[in-house]
Amino acid sequence: MPAPLFLSGPCEICGQKTSGRHFGVMSCRSCAAFFRRAATCSRIFGRCPNGNCKLLENGKFKCKKCRMKRCLEVGMDETKFQCNRDLISSSNKFQKRVSLIEPPPQSLSTFLGRPTLLLCCEPTRASHIKTLINVTYMVDVARDILKRDVSTKIPYQFHNSLERLALSLEEIRSREPDEKIKMLRKIGQEESLLIWEQAFLRAVEWFSNFSEFNALDELSKMTILKSAWISWTRLEKLAETADHQRKKIFGDSVMMCGNDACLDLANYEVDLTWCTNYTTEQLLFYLSPEIEQNHFLSLQELVELNPTSTELSYMLLQITLHLAGKKAQGQLLEITEMLLEAQGNHLHEYYVKKLKMPNYVMRLAKLMKINRRIESDMRDRVEKNHIARIFNILKVEFSEPDMFEST
């Protein structure tokens, strides 16, 4: 162990107790501060009549000229000054110093001119030539479904359109028995397109039982469906998955992803070669919203709340009509707000008269919280798809692009 440094003893200038080595000399803080001030200022001390004054007399230093001379004689060195280390500086010096400091280094994303999302992506893999996927047939089938007469389709008694939608949802779900659900191990082009087709047509069929919706013109109906089917599917599949988990049919990581198919999020393979030249690892951040925390949190809340078919039908209407109206604005926004107001009255009647639950505000707030979480994920997906289009991440495009902007 090295010997400790000797930092005690008298000041070599005035003889007082030293506080350490300052500017190359063992000195007290007073003499060190004096030398720093005197050596940096432009003031010239007057001539000393004695030439060799006693530095410290009655606790005071009378002659600055002799004190400065003594500092230089014992070896104080002004080249050892350390500048720009003061915690408190005058505003002028501070501004001058800041102006000389270089700006902070650029982040990697700023330097490369690419967002953090795409730092690991190779520009040579960008797809400037797109493959068109024609989904016009889905829109044509949707128009045919909406033209059908569904007035006698449901033989049960209902009092309003919300109850009719609840019965329709139960009837649609009853077509796929639990024992016929198959587990998917791989998601590729064929599986993706089939799942999207099933989801879109399922949403169309459900909306076809909405009497107020059927009264709208065809353009308004198709605009709502194109904007709403993905959010409708997200919520409906979450609710269906929660129902299966409640019955102990599914594990915690399994979810419905089609009319008769499910997917284990902890054990499946994704094939993206049909839609992009980038690898799954490069697009991991882009693909994450489907499996992130919001998804499982919403699923857990649906398991605990166990919404009825009527409550779920209102949730489906709220999230779809709200997003469709917000996107389209104008007259369609007024239409969706009018439809939601009417269904809100039906839901109030359902709580008060059928469930005998006049204080339902807290429960409804929890259900709407799930909707807001899904809406947040949808906005995130739209933004990332926009980035993907700008940087040509995907090598496919759809004949109805507004239908798939949040997939």
Swiss-Prot record:
Function: Orphan nuclear receptor.
Organism: Caenorhabditis elegans
Localization (cell): Nucleus
Protein family membership: Belongs to the nuclear hormone receptor family.
Protein name, as recorded: Nuclear hormone receptor family member nhr-134
Boundaries of every NR LBD domain copy: 157-407
UniProt keyword list: DNA-binding, Metal-binding, Nucleus, Receptor, Transcription, Transcription regulation, Zinc, Zinc-finger
SMART domains assigned: HOLI, ZnF_C4
Molecular function via GO: DNA-binding transcription factor activity; RNA polymerase II cis-regulatory region sequence-specific DNA binding; zinc ion binding
InterPro entries found in the cross-reference section: C.elegans_Orphan_NR, HNF4-like_DBD, NHR-like_dom_sf, Nucl_hrmn_rcpt_lig-bd, Znf_hrmn_rcpt, Znf_NHR/GATA
Pfam families: Hormone_recep, zf-C4
GO cellular component: nucleus
Zinc fingers (NR C4-type), renumbered ranges: 11-31, 47-66
Main localization category: nucleus
